A protein has these predicted regions:
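The Skp1-binding helix-loop-helix core of N-terminal F-box domains in SCF E3 ubiquitin ligase adaptors
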Residues: 22-28
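Divalent metal-cofactor coordination and adjacent catalytic microenvironments
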Residues: 36-101, 150-165
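Internal mixed-charge
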Residues: 1-19, 31, 35, 39-46, ...
């Protein structure tokens, strides 16, 4: 029987960030702050692939396609790696494709995206695979990865600030501040993406850019 297990990810409530934003944007409704925060995290995740989910999949005899859906209100951005898993050792990575039309080729293992959903095709039955996914939050997300607060707090806040200041006809509206925070967010995304590729060896990326007043 097929077995799909998602590794647990440490989480924190959105309030950890919302408390800071509500102090800065005192006239903003809570729902607007929450929406801006989720949108900012999703943008950052798409640009950097810093939000990951690890899946262990054991294939079932006669079944070729497997749908991988994170259980924590996350959407899959991309499959980052797939390896055969033997206890504590990995073999791979395996060949990956992005078109279901290619699924008849002679490669042993194929991964592709079908209608916006991640599908895993593994002809070898009874084999366990370790799959790493890049993900982003959906609108229903009520918690976020604790790594965002530990490593990318200012990046997330700057992303939310850029969206909030860009809103028209608000007491706090300021295109100048919105553009400044957007540039700061983009610089932070570039740094975070490099840090993620290096395995977070450079340490936390917090408050690397000056605040905008």
């Amino acid at each position: 029987m097929a077995n799909v297990v998602f590794e647990n990810t440490p989480k924190l409530p959105l309030d950890e960030f919302l408390d800071v934003l509500s102090f800065e944007f005192t006239d903003a409704p809570y729902g607007l702050l929450e929406d801006s925060l989720k949108r900012a995290i999703a943008r950052i995740a798409e640009r950097t692939n810093i939000l990951r989910r690890t899946v262990f999949l054991t294939t079932e005899c006669g079944v070729h396609n497997y749908l991988l859906e994170p259980p924590d209100c996350m959407d899959v951005i991309a499959i980052m790696s797939i390896c055969e898993w033997h206890g504590n050792t990995m073999h791979g990575p395996l060949h990956r494709l992005t078109s279901p039309q290619c699924s008849c080729c002679c490669f042993d293992n194929i991964v592709y995206v079908d209608r916006g959903e991640i599908v895993f095709s593994a002809p070898k039955s009874g084999t366990t695979y370790r799959i790493e996914l890049s993900v982003k939050p959906t609108h229903d997300t009520c918690e976020f990865d604790s790594a965002l607060l530990n490593h990318h707090e200012e990046l997330v806040l700057n992303g939310a600030r850029a969206l909030l200041y860009a809103l028209p006809d608000k007491p706090w509206s300021s295109m100048q501040r919105a553009q400044a925070y957007e540039l700061s967010m983009l610089r932070g995304c570039a740094e975070a993406a490099v840090d993620r590729m290096l395995g977070n060896q450079r340490g936390a990326l917090k408050a690397k850019h000056p605040r905008i007043f």
